[in-house]
Amino acid sequence: MNLVVYAVPIFILAILVELAYGLAVHRNTYRLNDSFSSLALGVLSQARRFVTLGVGGYVYHLITVYFSLPLMDASHWFTWVLAMVLYDFCYYWLHRLGHERTILWAAHVAHHQSEDYNLTTALRQTSTGFLLGWIFYIPMYLVGIPAEVVVTVGSINLIYQFWVHTEHLPKLGWYEWIFVTPSNHRVHHAQNDIYLDRNYGGLFILWDRLFGTFQEELDEEPVVYGIRGPLKSWNPVRALTHIYVDMARDSWRTADWRDKLRVWVSRTGWRPADVAASDPREKIDPAHFVKYDPRVPGPVSLYALFQLVAAVLLLNFMENAELAYGQGVAL
């Protein structure tokens, strides 16, 4: 069961509470333009499910039928504990390679484009992650974890990650050693040199400690949020596609046929030498970083807000209809 649909009202309430708290203590972490952009991308990521075909789902079915170990008992507690741990392990490697390989970063980058850090950032999700992300969860089906368990623990993992996107909670003592927290996840969203590409866990931070990717948040190094190549746009289509466009452009322009292919499997940040020389990209110094914050006229903001609310209501209607249909079929 996908529990994210049921969590949406809690998400909205929590965002309003965080906003009110920030205003009350004179430490507001919200900007209308940035928050709207994050929420719009979140809506698109959910709407995408209605218009795409799941290649991954078909592969999972084939694995379950022909290649997996005997299915585990979905009513046994051990199945759920194993699934929760294994899901986060698979997520760690998807997340890590999502930063280290350009083709995967192209899908994940949308989540990191926000230059603020608040609960709307948690909802800033990709709409293209389904293209390759499913590959990393194949081990769960190979060991015989039932599909309904995988989907449920996946939604629990995602819901857990919501609350860690806040600047208002400090370090949490012993909890920091085992689980992902606001402090160690703030590090993950930073573009500071010392923090870059660290803390990939979704539920457990233990993977980062085990595989050498952990970095503690330091008082002397305030976090600078965002990406090294700022988007400088509120256009959601550009937010979702700009890395793909950059890869295609570099592949087209380079004269070396090997580099034309290498672009698509390279480490994040790599570019063909001839293209990098003829079309260098702006280098960002986090120490002097200035947030993208153009003034948006009031009427435009109101119209955009109206569109967002309408989209959320329509999406909620479609998801409820989908749930009702599924329950009807089950009966």
Region annotations inferred by a language model:
Residues 43-52, 74-230:
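Membrane-embedded catalytic scaffold of the fatty acid hydroxylase/desaturase
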Residues 51-56, 128-136, 303-314:
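Core segments of transmembrane alpha-helices
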Residues 58-81:
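Juxtamembrane/interfacial segments at transmembrane-helix boundaries in multi-pass membrane proteins
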Residues 16-37:
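Membrane-interface helix-loop junction between the first two transmembrane segments
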